[in-house]
């Protein structure tokens, strides 16, 4: 069982970089469907992904049709859209014989309407109030992906953290780091 986050023609490099970091932290494959709204080596995207780029399995697809041709018979594809009435948390993502693909549309216009109609039974919604048009793409990815991983028992992920084994602890255990930020009140 493998999870995939699929971004259809993403426009904002910082969102894509943040999503790549989430994919690195969850052992999730990131599929990018072109055209992208930025260059893959964009500085903002690189910064948002920090130094985790070597930990991300990124797969590029020329267009939506090219991506669809990569799906196998046991793959489950879900389209995340505000136009669905089915809640993403009401789906079972635990079949070990399936790979799960979570497809997210571009930040401004979402997924193509014809694509959503063709796969209408695969559309899922993240609940939200009518106070906003939509959630941030990166936040939406994290919500859906972590629900799938929760159901799957967080495979190959730390579910607790022990500070004494933290490879970064020396960088965060320096009092001067905090004193510098406190200032005088």
From Swiss-Prot:
A Gene Ontology BP annotation from the UniProt entry: wobble position ribose methylation
Pfam families, sorted: SpoU_methylase
Domain of life of the native organism: Bacteria
Chief location bin: cytoplasm
Catalytic activity: cytidine(34) in tRNA + S-adenosyl-L-methionine = 2'-O-methylcytidine(34) in tRNA + S-adenosyl-L-homocysteine + H(+); 5-carboxymethylaminomethyluridine(34) in tRNA(Leu) + S-adenosyl-L-methionine = 5-carboxymethylaminomethyl-2'-O-methyluridine(34) in tRNA(Leu) + S-adenosyl-L-homocysteine + H(+)
Keyword Transmembrane helix: no
The keyword S-adenosyl-L-methionine appears for this protein: yes
Gene3D superfamilies assigned: 3.40.1280.10
Cellular localisation: Cytoplasm
Role noted for this protein: Could methylate the ribose at the nucleotide 34 wobble position in tRNA.
Similarity-based family: Belongs to the class IV-like SAM-binding methyltransferase superfamily. RNA methyltransferase TrmH family. TrmL subfamily.
Protein name, as recorded: Putative RNA (cytidine(34)-2'-O)-methyltransferase
Organism of origin: Lactobacillus gasseri (strain ATCC 33323 / DSM 20243 / BCRC 14619 / CIP 102991 / JCM 1131 / KCTC 3163 / NCIMB 11718 / NCTC 13722 / AM63)
């Amino acid at each position: 069982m493998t999870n995939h986050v699929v971004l259809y023609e993403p426009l904002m490099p910082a969102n894509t970089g943040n999503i790549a970091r989430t994919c690195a932290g969850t052992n999730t494959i990131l599929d990018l469907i072109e055209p992208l709204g930025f260059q893959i080596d964009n500085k903002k995207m690189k910064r948002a992904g920090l130094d985790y780029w070597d930990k991300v399995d990124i797969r590029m697809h020329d267009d939506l049709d090219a991506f669809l041709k990569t799906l196998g018979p046991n793959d489950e594809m879900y389209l995340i859209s505000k136009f669905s009435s089915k809640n993403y948390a009401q789906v079972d993502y635990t079949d070990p014989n399936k790979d799960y693909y979570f497809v997210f549309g571009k930040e401004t216009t979402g997924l193509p309407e014809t694509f959503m109609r063709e796969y209408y039974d695969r559309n899922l919604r993240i609940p939200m109030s009518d106070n906003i048009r939509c959630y941030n793409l990166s936040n939406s990815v994290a919500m859906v992906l972590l629900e799938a991983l929760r159901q799957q028992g967080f495979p190959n992920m730390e579910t607790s953290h022990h500070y004494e084994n933290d490879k970064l602890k020396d960088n965060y255990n320096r009092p001067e780091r905090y004193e510098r930020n406190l200032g005088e009140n």
